[in-house]
Amino acid sequence: MAKRVYAIAMRYAQALHELAKEQKSLDKWQEDLQNLSRLTEDASVDEFLSNPKIVSARKHAVLAKLSDIDPLMLNLVDMLVATRRLGIMRAISGEYNRLLNEARGVEDAIVTTAKPASEADTEIIRQQLSKITGKKINILTATDPGLIAGLKARIGDKLIDGSISRRLVLLQNEISQGRI
């Protein structure tokens, strides 16, 4: 089921990305998708939009008043409501961001540290990851005291684990196998 949702979201995102390129509105549409994603995650908004008793024109008008969203983006919401796919808005937004980053040579990295990293440390990490990947890096930070020290960086499907907890596990394995 998740693969199917992803495939559907990917098709919508690709179509939106192409249309946004034609309209020269890549950043505006990214912002609109993020806003719509946040809006549709609100239970009351989702309930309103999913209510079949409320006509589409009314839903469209309410959304238009709620935010400064491109009319073509409102058409997307209308289509998702009509096909009962509003629940994939977040996936569409995420996939659109991925396509936009890919086109710009940017990659997201989730960097987890034992305690919050300073801005200077984050910048050093960004530079090092940029050297490794050859791309610009957006860093999303997280903390996990279980790492003890060091960091883990997830870039796409790759994981760089430079944490002390990982080194301790490796050392424990070496000892248990009699190598040390």
From Swiss-Prot:
Keyword Ion transport attributed: yes
> Does the keyword Membrane feature in the UniProt annotation?
yes
A Gene Ontology molecular function term for this protein is: proton-transporting ATP synthase activity, rotational mechanism
Q: Name one Pfam family in it.
A: OSCP
Q: Which UniProt keywords apply?
A: ATP synthesis, Cell membrane, CF(1), Hydrogen ion transport, Ion transport, Membrane, Transport
Cell compartments where the protein resides: Cell membrane
What InterPro entries is this protein classified in?
Answer: ATP_synth_OSCP/delta_N_sf, ATPase_OSCP/dsu
Q: How does it sit in the membrane?
A: Peripheral membrane protein
Cellular component GO terms, alphabetical: plasma membrane; proton-transporting ATP synthase complex
The protein's role, per its UniProt record: F(1)F(0) ATP synthase produces ATP from ADP in the presence of a proton or sodium gradient. F-type ATPases consist of two structural domains, F(1) containing the extramembraneous catalytic core and F(0) containing the membrane proton channel, linked together by a central stalk and a peripheral stalk. During catalysis, ATP synthesis in the catalytic domain of F(1) is coupled via a rotary mechanism of the central stalk subunits to proton translocation.
Q: Which family does it belong to?
A: Belongs to the ATPase delta chain family.
Q: Partners and quaternary state?
A: F-type ATPases have 2 components, F(1) - the catalytic core - and F(0) - the membrane proton channel. F(1) has five subunits: alpha(3), beta(3), gamma(1), delta(1), epsilon(1). F(0) has three main subunits: a(1), b(2) and c(10-14). The alpha and beta chains form an alternating ring which encloses part of the gamma chain. F(1) is attached to F(0) by a central stalk formed by the gamma and epsilon chains, while a peripheral stalk is formed by the delta and b chains.
The record's annotation in NCBIfam families points to:
ATP_synt_delta
Q: Which PANTHER family match?
A: ATP SYNTHASE DELTA CHAIN
Q: What protein is this chain from?
A: ATP synthase subunit delta
